[in-house]
Amino acid sequence: MPARAIMFQGTGSDVGKSLIVAGLARALTLRGLKVAPFKPQNMSNNAAVTADGGEIGRAQALQARAARRPMTVHMNPVLLKPQSEIGSQVVVQGRVIGNAKASAYQAMKPQLMKAVLDSFHHLIADTDIALVEGAGSASEINLRAGDIANMGFAQATQIPVVLIGDIDRGGVIASLVGTQAVLAPDDAALIAGFLVNKFRGDPALFASGMSEIATRTRWTSLGLIPHFADARRLPAEDALGLPGGGVWSRDRPKIAVLAYPRISNFDEFDPLRLEDGVDLQFLRPGTPIPGDAAVVILPGSKATIADLAALREAGWDIDLQAHLRRGGRVLGICGGYQMLGRMISDPDGHEGAPGAVAGLGLLDIETTLTGDKALRDVEGRLTQDEAPFRGYEMHIGRTDGPAAQHPFLVFSDGRRDGAVAAGGQIAGCYVHGLFADDHLRAHWLRGLGTTASGQSYDADVDATLDALAAHLERYIDIDRILDLARVPRAIT
């Protein structure tokens, strides 16, 4: 039987599209269907390494996990990784093809649509149902010409659309009805139903609201979804979902993660954030590093040189010196590791104008940004105490120097990575995902004088996906969604 497909678009960003697709993927998988998540175009600096050696957005990685399928580049054929306010790195079917400003990217879309459709039909060849996620807002009609992410894709494949609105931010009736009003008639005709997400309170109080939306739009009402509190236990992809700073705990070690403007792969700190024995918070620019922090983490960055400038502008370079004088620890990961060195050179202009900038000088290393990108899963041991680890590499650049002769990690193939200085007080490496390894996380927390919960992070994510699936089974008419799904139009 040919695969069917249905698309989920939103009235705006952060309405819950990714989470709903993940929950439906798990629910339908538990029903015995072979599910494929798909997002034509994603914009995110949080990415995952796929089984076929490329990269996709973290949301699609979670959706693949929910569907219990190996990740493939075909689940997210176009990934945009913002490097500035007007430009992004463009990744097509898992491979970097270059950088483009927003205006130039528009001209690339006809060719990108070919890659999108190629990946989509490759993916559904061995699938019962494809759950397609749109991007941003369906109502951005200024971007409709050449669109590959929302209605442009839906029209090309002739698959029905479910529109999702977020009641938590207010104005959900206007956002749903208003979307229909601004869409071209042929695009609006593809919307078959709607969902209202993130409801809080008594659902009976919004029954008339659901009826009003259905009456005005003539769309099928598919469900009013209460807020899912455990969403915080799942990896977030967008910086919109990045937890803000709060009141620090008085009796737990404090871990401060510097959230510079182009922070990347920040979901790798979720396993630490969920541990009761520590208090991990992301610090926005303008928030000082607390004087009694146990560890300051410099995370990955999609624009290392620009984020290093932002770090200095925030005064964090001065805070780091004071932190080290008080005996605190510093850990740099990927771009954060590069920042810890003496110099970052970009001779070919991968991040902007060619040039070089001074680093923080906390590690005796220098980095040269190169065009080659390392993308691989890795494992090995820490050099200081032989603790095993698993993680992944996702970076450009070569780093070397005297401090690299004292590496932080040794891979199972004998390669070395990172650097350690000041008796272990300062360390850095290129490897992401270290803290998802339960054994390494427990080992690292013992070094802070606290203990891990003993829970498996992977098992916790899977249990949360099961709970999300049960939540959606209760509040969404999933049978009706299956009825609405259609066989996509073949593209020749």
UniProtKB/Swiss-Prot annotation:
CDD domains in the record: GATase1_CobQ
Keyword set, alphabetical order: Cobalamin biosynthesis, Glutamine amidotransferase
Entry keyword annotation includes Transmembrane: no
Active-site residues annotated for this sequence: 334 (nucleophile), 432
GATase cobBQ-type domain boundaries: 252-440
SS bond list: none
One example GO MF annotation: catalytic activity
Record has Manganese as a keyword: no
Pathway: Cofactor biosynthesis; adenosylcobalamin biosynthesis
GO BP terms, alphabetized: cobalamin biosynthetic process
Pfam families given in the database record: CbiA, GATase_3
Alphabetical list of PANTHER family matching this protein: COBYRIC ACID SYNTHASE, DETHIOBIOTIN SYNTHETASE
HAMAP family per record: CobQ
Function: Catalyzes amidations at positions B, D, E, and G on adenosylcobyrinic A,C-diamide. NH(2) groups are provided by glutamine, and one molecule of ATP is hydrogenolyzed for each amidation.
Record family assignment: Belongs to the CobB/CobQ family. CobQ subfamily.
UniProt-recorded name of the protein: Cobyric acid synthase
Organism for this UniProt entry: Bradyrhizobium sp. (strain BTAi1 / ATCC BAA-1182)
